Swiss-Prot record:
Keywords from the named record: Heme, Iron, Membrane, Metal-binding, Monooxygenase, Oxidoreductase, Transmembrane, Transmembrane helix
Gene behind the chain: CYP71A26
Signal peptide: none
Protein name according to UniProt: Cytochrome P450 71A26
GO cellular component, one term: membrane
Cofactor(s), names only, from the UniProt record: heme
UniProt-listed InterPro entries: Cyt_P450, Cyt_P450_CS, Cyt_P450_E_grp-I, Cyt_P450_sf
Family: Belongs to the cytochrome P450 family.
Membrane topology: Single-pass membrane protein
CDD domains: CYP71-like (cd11072)
């Protein structure tokens, strides 16, 4: 009996020494600042309701490069422009992949889309289809008539409610949905309640946290709270919808060429040198919806919020637009090119309110060094675009202030070359639809301030317009933006 006891104690002692030495070697090898976590869950409890804000606060204490653990998963958090450059440019290829995600795999056709597909040949092929065939400058210009028609309908809707409170948040979401529907699918689905409800479910679930993805032995929590059931139902409903859309295009003759038509033509004619199947078509089209509708409407919503909170900025923008357009009833896309203050307003809104404050996670595919730190393969990377937009070293002491003037004499742009402002990402994983999104945002905002004078409605209190944010993958206002339009004087 004593021998067995002694043997057991010896085994425990040896195992303890081995574990201790491994941990010690790991600490010597990786000296990254790391907030203390809890057993099993790591730092998950520190994310809070708004992770981009919580992680920004932690970075003020632990630095712009810190290592957290979400359950068993090591997560590197980047909160400065300089370090974002290292990840997205210097070591772009190493960090170009995406981590596994139960939610993305279930909702995005097992990651056959462009945004969540792991780095590799399939992703390169699908990215080239998007860049060359869907979001080329030629394609963006070809849908100008769609943008003009939908903006005209929006302006008429506002005109009919002149001097009455209008829900600008709802109007902007509707406009964006209608434009994306016509461009991607060939017709509008915005009036269909089932479609609206489905897209709301999809966007909400994409921003939902899955416990099981980070703490596998707690995966039962996802089942208990109904997440697994919601994912299954929504994935099936989404697939049925897009399958019906694709089949309608296969069966019918259409006058206008939309994204589905383009993808089907590529599949039929084999013009890209590789095969594109039905699943890939549906996944890419869904990417357009997820990446286009929520993010564009969010940016316009926040831009109008800030302009209404800062009447002097609104007045200066109106003066610029009205000076260039004079008595014209609408603003054209050519005239936008001469509106420097409008572009500054868009940049400032993107700085303070990036639609995706935490960029879609990256993952290292091999060991790499960032400065003096060793980053092992398989490390997830979260780039906090929201925190980078508030770096005092870059933007000055007034980082929390909405001041478009800061961009007028600045070369910083949002197209991925300046890492101080990366709302659309950078490097290999940069959003391929930047031009499409920006032209819509600019022309909508210009027309809103050209045609009408605006003031906040009593339904939108000062507190609501200031800081209240929703939760989800794209950060909207928590409360709808109500404003009152009046005819220009």
């Amino acid at each position: 009996m004593m021998i067995m006891f002694f043997l057991l104690c010896s085994i425990i002692f040896v195992v303890t020494i081995i574990i201790f030495r491994k941990q010690k070697r790991g600490k010597k090898r990786n000296t990254l600042p790391s907030p203390p976590g809890l057993p099993l869950i790591g730092n998950l409890h520190q994310l809070g309701r708004h992770p981009h804000r919580s992680l920004c606060s932690l970075s003020h204490r632990y630095g712009p490069l810190m290592l957290l653990h979400f359950g068993r998963v090591p997560v590197l958090v980047v909160s400065s422009a300089e370090l974002a450059r290292d990840v997205l440019k210097t070591h772009d290829r190493v960090f170009a992949s995406r981590p596994r995600s139960k939610i993305f795999e279930k909702l995005l056709y097992d990651k056959h889309d462009v945004a969540s597909a792991p780095y590799g040949e399939y992703w390169r092929q699908m990215k080239s289809v998007c860049v060359l065939h869907l979001f080329s400058n030629k394609m963006v210009r070809s849908f100008r008539e769609v943008r003009e028609e939908e903006i005209s309908l929006m302006m008429e809707k506002i005109r009919k409610s002149i001097s009455l409170p209008v829900n600008l948040s709802k109007i902007l979401v509707s406009l964006t949905n209608d434009v994306i529907c016509k461009v991607a699918l060939g017709r509008k689905y915005g009036g269909e309640t089932d479609f609206k409800e489905l897209m709301e479910r999809l966007n909400k679930l994409l921003g939902t946290f899955s416990v099981g993805s980070y703490v596998p032995w707690l995966a039962w929590i996802d089942w208990i709270r109904g997440l697994d059931c919601q994912l299954e139902k929504t994935a099936n409903d989404v697939d049925k919808f897009f399958e019906r859309v694709v089949q309608d295009h296969v069966d019918g003759n259409r006058d206008m060429t939309d994204f589905v038509d383009v993808l089907l033509a590529i599949q039929r004619d084999k013009t890209v040198g590789f095969e594109i199947n039905r699943v890939s078509i549906k996944a890419i089209v869904m990417n357009v919806f997820v990446g286009g509708t929520d993010t564009s409407s969010t940016l316009m919503e926040w831009a109008m919020t800030e302009l209404l909170r800062h009447p002097k900025c609104l007045k200066r923008l109106q003066e610029e637009v009205r000076t260039i357009c004079k008595d014209k009833s609408s603003v054209s896309e050519e005239e936008i090119q001469n509106m420097s203050y409008l572009k500054a307003v868009i940049k400032e809104a993107l700085r303070l309110h990036p639609p995706l404050p935490l960029m879609v996670p990256h993952e290292s595919t091999q060991d790499v060094r960032l400065g003096d730190h060793h980053i092992p393969a398989g490390t997830q990377v979260l780039i906090n675009a929201w925190a980078i937009g508030r770096e005092a070293a870059t933007w000055g002491p007034d980082v929390e202030e909405f001041r478009p003037e800061r961009h007028l004499d600045s070369s910083v742009d949002y197209r991925g070359q300046a890492f101080e402002l990366i709302p659309f990402g950078s490097g290999r994983r940069i959003c391929p639809a930047i031009s499409f999104a920006v032209v819509l945002n600019e022309v909508v905002l210009a027309n809103l301030v050209h045609r009408f004078d605006w003031r906040l409605s009593v339904e939108s209190t000062e507190d609501q317009t200031e800081v209240a944010e929703s939760t989800g993958i794209a950060i909207h206002r928590m409360f709808p933006l109500y404003a009152i339009a009046s005819n220009t004087t």
